[in-house]
């Protein structure tokens, strides 16, 4: 405990001199009327590490319908989707696994200390300004240290508050579609003065998710409908922005999410029975203060409180209702200090502190009441001159694990110990070089070392968890070339090509402890290599006619390299496809804009053993989107129709969890 107090004291001294901003570059700007020196699109080409972006216009023109659909349009991503509007959706990047993917919401990382995997199905696109994926280090060095702790970060940026007038602005929207889907959305925003703005967002989603599916049993084809799949989901946000003066700004957010859903379970022959129910609730509040002085120093301070609950019940459990519920909490604060002595150099120091704890409804689910203190510090330097940009970072991570005692009669010897404390220095470096002075063609290279602390489930879950686990260590290497052509008014082109090699050691996997019980151990070693390619082009025939095309392709080999004598050696890791790709072709015109889009994913295995007959077949999902925008003075109406999986393909992403076949969705959006 004395060590914790000492560390917090040192951190407290650091907090008085640290902070951050949310600009795309690391330039210092006045907080009033922020000017971004590069467009977000161009930054995907100049970045020293792979950066992929979908802004609000992309989401519309590419026919994106939900967060999972949006992520399919980004290279290097593998999605685990359990199907339907309420199905859990997690994402892994370049074979690392979902626990290695961080998710940032309006510049602050989301927390999931229990499983380490963020369920992205809870975040809709209706209030999103853009989504970006950073693989490696972010060129914007003015970020919390926590954003540097994962191999990849998915950034979700919501719509910004208005700055043009003091009139109230109201957005109303309703979506409805197949399988009982309906989702109303409301957003109110207003500038009350030139210093204070406010917005409120509300959203509700209901779906029966009773979609049909087919199941092959030898020569027999079974036709059935998904059952026990209903969902009720609500989400609300309050946001404010206060420009205290030209150099000081305070922003805040209050967020609440509630989803009461049934879990349909796996589809098996002759049965579709399930009594599982899950209610997820999440509340957080966060504030961010930004200031700058002297045109050289900038400071950002963020604080956040997060609470979430997962209430699980199975009414069909033998012997009565099975209740496995969990509650987790986090207190988090971060400060960052940015120093830009001249136009070439930038330096950032960031320090974070987080306290997390977890408790369950029974000692037989979580051993004791674990909690963790986390201290993170990062020092970053960035150098830019003409055609060369170099970035280097050193991250220090400290995890102090403890647990409250459980009654002596209720614990085993392994439960007497908390997880091990962990500390590590993690270096990273990246660079970008412009090949020709008159052409936007760049080569880039990067290296990043990082480690992942075991989650509370991996350390404390009854029988399954082990407090003796070591952290997973990852190394990632990337080389790439990028190109853009934007000098012609009627034609724009963006291309990127990256090759990578990743290495994971001390991988945490579950192995049989005895005939009936599995437990987590460090046994795995994984080698990953592949390529990511993207292409985006727009050709405008006239101000009202244009053709837009975007596409990406990824190849990834994710191999088990732990034991050469094992029959699984060099086999593809479970749920990692070798080939993925997507494309969208859009025709803009004065009448109805039309987009045809598709996703292709190759076959996968649901296990690392590759048992005969268990391979999940690859699939192609093609959709059609038609939309029209009409303007009436200052009011705007948008009508949109989406036909999903229009060729009615039956496929699975997760083994025995069939995805919906052909369906439709209608969206009506009116802005006052």
Question: What is the role of each PLM region?
Answer:
Residues 20-60, 68, 98:
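Short, acidic, small-residue-rich periplasmic hinge/interaction motif at the N-terminus
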Residues 68-109:
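Extracytoplasmic beta-strand/coil segments of soluble accessory domains associated
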Residues 125-171:
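A beta-strand signature from Gram-negative outer-membrane beta-barrel systems
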Residues 207-213, 222-235, 241-300, 305-330, ...:
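Flexible loop and strand-edge segments within Gram-negative outer membrane beta-barrel domains
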Residues 296, 300-314, 442-448, 452, ...:
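Membrane-embedded beta-barrel scaffold of Gram-negative outer-membrane proteins
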Residues 340-356, 361-502, 584:
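Structural signature of Gram-negative outer-membrane beta-barrels, strongest in the C-terminal barrel
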Residues 387-390, 399, 494-503, 521-607, ...:
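Gram-negative outer-membrane beta-barrel transporters
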Residues 549, 600-607, 615-617, 626-672:
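C-terminal beta-signal and adjacent terminal beta-strands/loops
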């Amino acid at each position: 405990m004395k060590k914790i107090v000492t560390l917090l004291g040192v951190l407290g001294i650091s907090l008085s001199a640290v902070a951050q901003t949310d600009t795309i570059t690391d330039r210092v700007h006045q907080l009033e009327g922020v000017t971004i020196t590069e467009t977000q699109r161009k930054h995907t080409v100049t970045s020293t590490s792979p950066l992929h972006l979908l802004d609000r216009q992309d989401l519309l023109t590419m026919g994106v319908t939900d967060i999972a659909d949006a992520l399919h349009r980004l290279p290097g991503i593998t999605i685990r989707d359990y199907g339907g509007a309420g199905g859990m959706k997690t994402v892994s990047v370049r074979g690392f696994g979902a626990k290695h993917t961080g998710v940032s919401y309006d510049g602050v990382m989301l927390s999931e200390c229990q499983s380490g995997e963020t369920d992205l199905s809870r975040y809709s696109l209706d209030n999103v300004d853009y989504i970006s994926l950073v693989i490696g280090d972010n060129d914007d060095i003015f970020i919390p240290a926590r954003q540097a702790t994962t191999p990849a970060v998915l950034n979700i940026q919501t719509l910004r508050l208005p700055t043009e007038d003091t009139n109230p602005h109201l957005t109303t929207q309703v979506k409805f579609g197949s399988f009982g889907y309906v989702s109303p959305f409301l957003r109110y925003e207003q500038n009350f003065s030139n210093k204070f703005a406010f917005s409120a967002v509300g959203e509700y989603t209901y779906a029966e998710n009773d979609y049909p599916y087919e199941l092959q049993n030898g020569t027999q084809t079974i036709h059935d409908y998904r059952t026990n799949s209903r969902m009720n989901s609500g989400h609300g946000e309050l946001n404010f922005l206060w420009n205290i003066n030209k150099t000081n700004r305070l922003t805040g957010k209050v967020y609440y999410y509630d989803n009461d859903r049934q879990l349909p379970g796996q589809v098996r022959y002759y049965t579709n029975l399930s009594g599982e129910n899950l209610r997820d609730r999440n509340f957080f509040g966060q504030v961010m203060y930004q200031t700058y002085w002297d045109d050289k120093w900038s400071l950002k301070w963020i604080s956040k409180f997060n609470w979430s609950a997962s209430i699980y019940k199975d009414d069909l459990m033998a012997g009565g209702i099975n209740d496995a519920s969990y509650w987790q909490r986090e207190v988090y604060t971060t400060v960052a200090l940015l120093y830009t002595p001249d136009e070439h150099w930038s330096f950032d120091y960031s320090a974070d502190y987080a306290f997390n704890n977890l408790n369950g409804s029974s000692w037989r689910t979580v051993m004791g009441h674990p909690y963790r203190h986390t201290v993170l510090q990062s020092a970053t330097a960035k150098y830019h001159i003409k055609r060369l940009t170099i970035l280097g970072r050193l991250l220090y991570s400290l995890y102090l694990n403890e647990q409250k005692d459980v009654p002596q009669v209720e614990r085993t010897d392994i439960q007497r110990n908390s997880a091990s404390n962990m500390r590590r220095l993690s270096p990273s470096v990246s660079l970008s070089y412009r090949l020709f002075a008159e052409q936007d063609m760049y080569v880039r290279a990067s290296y990043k070392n990082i480690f992942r602390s075991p989650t509370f489930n991996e350390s404390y879950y009854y029988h399954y968890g082990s407090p003796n686990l070591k952290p997973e260590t990852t190394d990632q290497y990337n080389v790439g070339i990028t190109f853009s052509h934007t000098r012609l008014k009627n034609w724009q082109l963006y291309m990127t090509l990256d090759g990578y090699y990743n290495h994971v050691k001390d991988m945490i996997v579950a192995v049989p402890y005895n005939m009936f019980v599995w437990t987590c151990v460090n046994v795995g070693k994984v080698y990953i290599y592949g390529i990511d390619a993207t292409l985006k082009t727009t050709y405008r025939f006239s101000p009202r006619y244009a053709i837009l095309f975007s596409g990406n392709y990824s190849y990834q080999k994710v191999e088990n390299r732990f034991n050469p004598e094992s029959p699984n050696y060099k086999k593809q890791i479970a749920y990692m496809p070798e080939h993925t790709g997507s494309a969208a072709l859009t025709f803009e015109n004065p009448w109805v804009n039309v987009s045809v889009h598709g996703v292709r994913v190759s076959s996968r295995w649901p296990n690392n053993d590759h048992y005969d007959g268990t391979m999940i077949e690859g699939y192609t999902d093609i959709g059609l989107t038609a939309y029209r925008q009409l303007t009436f003075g200052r009011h705007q109406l948008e009508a949109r129709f989406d036909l999903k999986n229009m060729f009615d393909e039956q496929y699975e992403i997760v083994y025995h969890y069939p995805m919906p076949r052909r369906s439709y969705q209608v969206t009506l959006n009116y802005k006052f």
